[in-house]
Amino acid sequence: MYQPAAPSPHLTADLFSVLLLCLADGNLLVFTAHVDSVLTSKEPLGAFCSPEEVKATADTELPDLYPAKYTLELESRNIYKMDELYPMPRTSGNQHPHTLHVTHPYDYFWFPQQKLARAILACFTFAAARARQLYGADTVTPPEPVAVQCTFSDVKSFGFLAYQLNTLDLREDNGIKNQVWVDGPYDLYESCNHETGLEGFSPIAFQRFLALYKNGLAA
């Protein structure tokens, strides 16, 4: 008996997602995340945590940034579009976000914290925009968490993270929180140049990369 195979995961390059959130103080935040590529799948990734574990995040205290304000490094604009975007249409066979790939050009210096923050922001923006696409523009708490994975890399290293969107309510510090798990970054090699070639190759990064790719995908 012939059984049609499920569509294979699809890799699309150079995508961005847009999310708008209005906070309790009246500030409208426009999140725009650009990624180098996105692996999408027919079925969504399963939640990384149980409902009980998600509920327990309400007891987690967030760091106090005072006297710094959360908009300190944000650019203020008076002209913007009120359009949210998740780049994959709901009619697509592979519409669910699986793994985002974020690279950091070597011609600009990035601190490790900046690389990680950029990856987390990309996960939040893509997952939240997907939740709004699925459940409506007014969605605050999606009925099901939206899970997404991400790799972030430069010339020499790879880092990995898993992100679970539980809420879009950023107005208060109480209530359930979103969750992120970070692994790495891991160096791919010790040195690489034209004279000696590649030295000190480490397979760990590729092992992690393969694990993320295979997670939730049919064999």
Question: For each predicted feature, which ranges?
Answer:
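Charge-rich, low-complexity intrinsically disordered linkers/tails
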Residues: 1-111, 177, 181-182, 187-219
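Short connector loops at helix/strand junctions that flank enzyme active sites
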Residues: 32, 117-119, 145
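Hydrophobic side chains in beta-strands
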Residues: 39, 124, 152-153
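Generic structural motif
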Residues: 42-44, 127-129, 155
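Arginine residue identity/basic-tract feature
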Residues: 77, 90, 118, 130-132, ...
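Acidic, metal/cofactor-coordinating or nucleic-acid-engaging core segments within structured domains
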Residues: 108-140
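Metal-dependent nuclease catalytic regions and adjoining charged, substrate-binding loops involved
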Residues: 132-211
